[in-house]
């Protein structure tokens, strides 16, 4: 590659005694696996730099599946994440690692991710930012569901009616109830990415769970386990 690339480290793991293997999301090259040689040495100038949620300029070499880092510098300080918000940000990273193929550019998704992190850093409630990012991710993965029109008739969604979701096809008017049933009001809120009530947020979360399941597979997300203690404490 030529020049510096805007990146975020999504995840890292030790490699040998002195190095790190990085899962990186880059603006123009998508997700990459990059070896950072010597990053774990005590005197490494990269110590503390290759962290999630820190905007970075990076440069690397290599044409295979594993690149080699040649330069990294912070663009700015890490976006501030604490507690429940931090767990939410780790969730975004884990989803990207799970669903994105290596070396596939997603420049618009990169900006969606950056905007989601900025929104999380200022949020009291992370749920709206998470739902908006999940919906953006589904769009970039080619999951083109129309929330504004009935899949059966093509008629506009009526906010007073009920609709049943057929996976990969869309929503049809229905009197059914259950996990795959949504009100027109909920669908219009999802379409607008505007969640003004808890009911609309819960519906958006239910939909994104359904839609992302084929991409995430059956293995549980580790970041979701971090939410369990907080949920239990709320109930006490």
From Swiss-Prot:
Is DNA damage among the key words of this record? yes
Q: Which GO terms describe its biological process?
A: DNA recombination; double-strand break repair
Pfam families named among the record's database cross-references: RecO_C, RecO_N
Q: What are the record's GO terms for cellular component?
A: bacterial nucleoid
**What are the UniProt keywords, alphabetically?**
DNA damage, DNA recombination, DNA repair
Q: Does the keyword Transmembrane helix apply?
A: no
Q: What does this protein do?
A: Involved in DNA repair and RecF pathway recombination.
Its protein name is DNA repair protein RecO
Q: Which organism is it from?
A: Photobacterium profundum (strain SS9)
């Amino acid at each position: 590659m030529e020049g510096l690339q805007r990146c975020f480290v999504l995840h890292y793991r030790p490699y040998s005694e002195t190095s790190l293997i990085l899962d990186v999301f880059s603006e123009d090259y998508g997700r990459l696996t990059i070896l950072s040689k010597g990053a774990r040495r005590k005197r490494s100038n990269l110590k503390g730099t290759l962290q999630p949620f820190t905007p970075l300029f990076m440069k690397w070499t290599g044409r295979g599946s594993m690149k080699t880092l040649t330069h990294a510098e912070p663009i700015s300080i890490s976006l501030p994440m604490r507690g429940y918000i931090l767990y939410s940000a780790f969730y975004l990273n884990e989803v990207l690692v799970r669903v994105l193929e290596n070396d596939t550019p997603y420049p618009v998704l990169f900006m969606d991710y950056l905007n989601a992190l900025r929104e999380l850093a200022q949020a009291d409630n992370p749920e709206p930012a998470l739902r908006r990012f999940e919906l953006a991710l589904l769009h970039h993965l080619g999951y083109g569901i129309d929330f504004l029109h009935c899949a059966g008739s093509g008629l506009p969604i009526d906010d007073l009616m009920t609709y049943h979701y057929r996976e990969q096809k869309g929503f049809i008017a229905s009197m059914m109830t259950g996990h795959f049933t949504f009100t027109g009001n909920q669908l219009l809120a999802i379409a607008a990415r505007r969640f003004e009530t808890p009911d609309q947020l819960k519906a958006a979360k239910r939909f994104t769970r359904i839609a992302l399941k084929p991409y995430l597979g059956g293995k549980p997300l580790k970041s979701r386990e971090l939410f369990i203690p907080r949920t239990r404490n709320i109930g006490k």
